[in-house]
Amino acid sequence: MLGEEAEPQWISEEVKTGTTIIAIEFNGGVVLGSDSRVSAGDSVVNRVMNKLSPLHDKIYCALSGSAADAQTIAEMVNYQLDVHSLEIDEDPQVRSAATLVKNISYKYKEELSAHLIVAGWDRRDGGQVFATLGGLLTRQPFAIGGSGSSYVYGFVDAEYRRGMTKEECQKFVVNTLALAMNRDGSSGGVAYIVTIDEHSTDEKVILGNDLPTFFDQ
């Protein structure tokens, strides 16, 4: 009506982490990474969301899809892992966390729109990466997801090799994110990196200006 301000379109759009996420195993641990842009339709509603969510001390998940759905799954699994850890009086296994994510994703697959990559370290199997798309559980040496992943499949296929060191995996993750954030309009902001091994869980933020550049930038 005349005299009333029109409601911005993004208010009625679903908020999505429309996104680039990645996780990779190295001998003794894992490296996870994500961009930080959150969008609703064509609007950016958050430029610095951390999409790497802790599920337990040495288990993280990378979030993509609907921000609300992905965060809800992560919070449910975090709670269940805390209870499970108290029951068994030891840290949970990475596969247990991934199985919980898989079960929730499959049970509510008609209602939820989220893809979580679960990665971490445990004493039984060391560093592990699991993809849980649509309720399917697969362990992989590395996994990528989100809208930005379609722009970097060629890069990761060409650059990945088994047996990379921790430092090489960190560089691989950062370069993959930088390329995806340059190509994908729904990815951007800063890069969040988490490195997990037996001895530590290290979180790092790389500002956009500090990300590597490539020949077309």
Curated annotation (Swiss-Prot):
CDD domains: proteasome_beta_type_6
InterPro entries from the UniProt entry: Ntn_hydrolases_N, Pept_T1A_subB, Proteasome_bsu_CS, Proteasome_sua/b, Proteasome_suB-type
GO BP term, example: proteasome-mediated ubiquitin-dependent protein catabolic process
Enzyme Commission identifier(s): 3.4.25.1
Pro-peptide region(s): 1-18
Gene3D superfamilies in the cross-refs: Glutamine Phosphoribosylpyrophosphate, subunit 1, domain 1
Its biological purpose: The proteasome is a multicatalytic proteinase complex which is characterized by its ability to cleave peptides with Arg, Phe, Tyr, Leu, and Glu adjacent to the leaving group at neutral or slightly basic pH. The proteasome has an ATP-dependent proteolytic activity. This subunit is involved in antigen processing to generate class I binding peptides.
Subunit structure: The 26S proteasome consists of a 20S proteasome core and two 19S regulatory subunits. The 20S proteasome core is composed of 28 subunits that are arranged in four stacked rings, resulting in a barrel-shaped structure. The two end rings are each formed by seven alpha subunits, and the two central rings are each formed by seven beta subunits. The catalytic chamber with the active sites is on the inside of the barrel. Component of the immunoproteasome, where it displaces the equivalent housekeeping subunit PSMB6.
Protein name: Proteasome subunit beta type-9
